[in-house]
Amino acid sequence: MAVARAFAVDPDLLLMDEPYGQLDVKLRYYLEDELVRLWKALKSTVIFITHNVEEAVYVAERILILSNKPTTIKAEVKVDLPRPRSVIDPNFVAIRKQVTDLIRWW
């Protein structure tokens, strides 16, 4: 509901910090699709903070990997995949692995 309220005011920028952390998997998948649909319709910039790599690859156009030093960006990964995305697509899996490897090796 909070996501719907946030988009209702048609923001230029929306910051979402772990918005799906306490949701079950089925609801999370549904809301990820809704977020992408709203983002495309409203053309707002969304900064989506998550520790879930699969979630990041699913919703993002680009992923910023932060280093262990505060406010330092270690890497940027472009996610140039068509929508709707499939978590079993080989390109999706490759990007997920790339992000995971960047996180693993600070």
Where are these regions (language model features)?
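Conserved catalytic motifs of ABC-family nucleotide-binding domains
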Residues: 10
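Catalytic Walker B motif of ABC-type/P-loop ATPase nucleotide-binding domains
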Residues: 14-17
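Short coil-to-helix N-cap segments within the nucleotide-binding domains
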Residues: 22-23, 27
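Conserved H-loop
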Residues: 44-49
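Conserved catalytic segment of ABC-fold P-loop ATPases
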Residues: 58-65
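Conserved beta-strand-loop-alpha-helix hinge in the C-terminal portion
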Residues: 69-96
